[in-house]
Amino acid sequence: MAKELATQLIEQLQAAGVQRIYGIVGDSLNPIVDAVRKTGGSGQGGIDWIHVRHEEAAAFAAAAEAQLTGNLAVCAGSCGPGNLHLINGLYDANRSGAPVLAIASHIPSKQIGSGFFQETHPDRLFNECSVYSELVSTAEQAPRVMHSAIQHAIGLGGVAVVTLPGDIAGLEATGETPLPATFRRATLIPDAASVRELAEAINAADKVAIFAGAGTEGAHDEVVALAEVIGAPIGHSLRGKDFMQYDNPYDIGMTGLLGYGAAAEGIEDADLLILLGTDFPYDQFLPGTRTAQVDRAAHKLGRRTDVDIAVHGDVLPTLAALKPLLTPKKSRRFLNQMLKKHDRLMNKAVGAYTRKVEKKQPIHPEYAASLLDQVAAEDAVFTADTGMCNVWTARYINPLGTRRLIGSYLHGSMANALPHAIGAQLAYPGRQVISVSGDGGLSMLLGELITLAAHRLPVNVVVFNNSTLGMVKLEMLVDGLPDFGVDVPDADYAAVARALGFHAVRVTDPARIEDAYREAFAHPGPSLVELITDPKALSIPPKITGSQVLGFATAMSKVVLNRGAGEAVSMARSNLRNIPRR
């Protein structure tokens, strides 16, 4: 019996190790969906179809699976609006370097260019959020396009899009199925002269600081050993937190708007800053000091700040080559100074809201986040929504070397946490997965609670309900504007979840938080814990500029004029202990 092209393409994905496809069915996608059905699902060694409520969630779920496992993940959308819905999640995946393949089905091939019903041009639309995007025009061409898409997604680390007209997908396959060219990613060895230049700069410097990013994955011990030899404090980016914060006696926290601890000051006070595997984009937090950068991606060298020494290579072999060239530093003055400052800041600012607040209502979000860190499993996977939940998880969730924490850190989309958790739970069915959302983010893709219920995924959803878009509110105040348009209508998310069959509870008393977590995490199916948190609690960055102070003061004066002094006083009380003290 003749094989359909759609079946051939699905066989290629199976050969590449794909276990599931996230998406929503639609007429132009029917041949692909039917080919998935014929595989028998994962129970028979085939591919599962994960039916989500919105294609954006399909792309986010695939992004999380790919980001966490490093393996190819797949999503699909029907022609026109269906695959257009993928685009936000695909931006997130591509910016995160996640190997995701998207099948964008298309209108009948003879109608392309005629302004047909639901016509778009996916091969053009997805160019900006992909490393590969091609239109299939014939059955003969299709297997090679699919092969190229697989290799691009895995090899370059990003999104590959195959635009496939439904009528072509239903044609007879014309040749053998090409197998993926499996490979192991090569290690990039740095140029010896560049390493010597870096060693000379380190040996000549009095105060060296390290700032580590996601590129330090797998190099934790080596980075810590470098810090020991040269007496350097280690700051990290949010994406580097998983890989550098744990078991690190030289950790001084994180810089940036979400940052904490002494990282901002340590980076600024150094006379040599070493950027290890980071493409940290916020140049206002990068000083004008002498800077060295190590990265395997040459195009990232020097694009955020001026770099005096650029080393093109992976972090691990770079440190191996660097080690014998270094002269150990006897002085620990700078390192000890930063460690003491970090300890003081963590105690006075970050730790302030985790003490003596067991009876304070509304719930302090920092306290709730610190309890979440204590109760969660040692190998839990956390997915954090963009906004204030990013702050609370960044500051209070400890990675332990066994946990993972992901979010839309480079794209900055709201509503990512819940669909990310879907992909994480399917990738790791035996691990505890915790989605941490604000009410704003959760409500944006609220329908994905149905996806959890339908697939009986034991994701633990934690909702910080403060009835406001907290991060946007903070940004307005810093810019000198009174908060406006940031209110989120009150909704009982626990009641919604219970109606879907979740174990769900709404918590207003902080004394109930820990028990609520434990009960939810012990439940075998999906759960939701809704926390009613203080809407006036704001994230204070580790480094406050004069313009930010002026903007906040201006905004507060407008708040007083518009809503009375009581509102401003209440906001001050909610945040006073968060202000960093030097």
Region spans (language model):
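N-terminal alpha/beta PP-like core and its mobile active-site loop of ThDP/TPP-dependent enzymes
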Residues: 1-333, 371, 375-378, 458-461, ...
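A general structural motif
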Residues: 2, 54, 114-116, 185-197, ...
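Active-site diphosphate/adenylate-binding microenvironment
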Residues: 6, 14, 27, 32-37, ...
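Generic beta-strand/beta-sheet core signal
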Residues: 24, 103, 163-165, 211-213, ...
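Active-site nucleophile and cofactor-binding loops and adjacent substrate-binding regions
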Residues: 24-27, 49-60, 75-81, 137-138, ...
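Thiamine diphosphate
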Residues: 118, 285, 454-546
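Phosphate/pyrophosphate-binding active-site segments
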Residues: 140, 163-164, 175-177, 200, ...
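Catalytic phosphate/nucleotide-handling subdomain of diverse soluble enzymes
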Residues: 416, 420-457, 464
